[in-house]
Amino acid sequence: MSGRQGGKAKPLKAPKKGEKDLSEEDVEFKKKQQEEAKKIKEMAAKAGQRGPLLGGGIKKSGKK
């Protein structure tokens, strides 16, 4: 006997999930989420164009 034969065998394909009945609230919520994700993505792209906010790195105090 090999070690892999024990237990329940996995099915080759997962069963397809049926269509969900979405209410108007669910549709609105999904639409709102997509719009927010789009805004966040645009803001991230816009922020990436400017470069780093801090440009000094480690600052030396000047004391010896």
UniProtKB/Swiss-Prot annotation:
It comes from the Eukaryota. Residues 53-64 have a biased composition (Gly residues). Keywords: Coiled coil. Residues 1-64 are annotated as: Disordered. Signal peptide: none annotated. Belongs to the TMA7 family. This is Translation machinery-associated protein 7 homolog. It comes from Caenorhabditis briggsae. The lineage of its organism: Eukaryota, Metazoa, Ecdysozoa, Nematoda, Chromadorea.
